[in-house]
């Protein structure tokens, strides 16, 4: 019995070893197969790349190299440097259009025609200069000529007008009653042509008879009050 048990234990131990060896061999076989497949795949990919390089040789990118141009060295900026601040863009502010205010036109009020007052011409007064006694003494004249001049007393020359005074026509002024906000001035009429001609004749011929005057030269109008 003991011998049978020992024989069975030995057989189990051998079987376990064989099973372990078989499992390890299977693992090694699978790993080998994977390696072989990987190598085949790499070989196949390399062969395809070589085939494409042979078919399209002109399409390979070539580096652009200029014989007379040296590479420009660029300084590496540290990453902590902040970017440069750009000036803010200022948009134009729309300004309100200034409208020109039209100036108010001054209202022109029509006034009645007023006859100009004619004045009589006067002859300028001739004032002869009388030499003083001191001036006579300063002159180099003989004494017999100076004595009669010194004894003479200067007499005033009467001032006379060449034309007699003529009456001046006074322009009638309107009389307005003190009524608030209701004042109507009377219309002034123009002087007739006959009165202007008569005034011209009086100026040209002062000897013309002036008095008596039966009618006034210009009609006098009474003011109208409301």
From Swiss-Prot:
The modification Phosphothreonine is found at residue 18. Important role in determination of the surface properties of the casein micelles. Mammary gland specific. Secreted in milk. The modification Phosphoserine is found at residues 21, 23-25. This is Beta-casein. The gene is CSN2. Keywords: Milk protein, Phosphoprotein, Secreted, Signal. GO terms for cellular component: extracellular region; extracellular space. It comes from the Eukaryota. GO terms for biological process: calcium ion transport; lactation. InterPro entries: Casein, Casein_beta, Casein_CS. It is found in: Secreted.
